Amino acid sequence: MRLISINVSLPRAVSVHGKEIETGIFKIPVSGPVVVNKLNLQGDGQADLSVHGGPDKAVYLYPWENILHWKKVLQRDDLGPGSFGENLTVEGLAEKEVPIGDEFAIGTARFVVTQPRLPCFKLALALETPSITKTFLESGRTGFYLRVLHEGTLQARDPVYPLPSREPEKVTVAEFVELYRCKRATRDQIRRILSLAALPRSWKEWLTSNGRLQAEETGD
């Protein structure tokens, strides 16, 4: 596992259907050591802090293998590091293999996986593909957000070192996304999700309120 690219950008104004909005989704690869702060990377920023950024979404990671997938599916040779608005393009961290709560070190910084990325219209804007938000979520290739446990510095080509997880249960990012999509889960799945210390409280409340995540009668 290794860091392929570090991508940052500050918010800028763009026109969408005649309306001006600010977005930080247009990430650009940068070279040299980059400082990791509690809320973002040096040189990076988020526009709408009500849905982006904050400690639980400080850094967005996207697997390089996913970019190769979309290059083929969308027939887009122009896609590369940063195309999906990610801060870190990493090789070897697939959603099906990475549980929420996993911890790892890159450079001198340390991170924990908190939640998947749910796409919004800004992804469609960045890729100039209106249908991508639905396809992106259905694919399960969402990437995931990181909380910064220890600030530090990192740079492209740094290895990614897995660290012992402090979670007693394992729920992969892919499993979580599928439960979110289908809105049904076994009682055991619900129990495991609610036990995750790394998963933000807002997610737990959303998933279990108003019957959004219903328990299947399976005898669990």
Where are the regions a protein language model picked out?
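Loop/turn positions that initiate beta-strands
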Residues: 101, 151, 155-158
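Short hydrophobic beta/alpha edge segments that flank linear recognition/processing sites
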Residues: 160-164
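A mid-sequence, solvent-exposed acidic-amphipathic segment
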Residues: 130-147
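Short alpha-helix capping/helix-loop boundary micro-motifs
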Residues: 90-91, 97, 143-150
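Electropositive, beta-rich accessory/interaction domains or terminal extensions
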Residues: 1-125, 131, 166-220
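A short pocket-lining beta-strand/turn micro-motif at the edge of beta-sheets
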Residues: 32, 142-144, 156-158
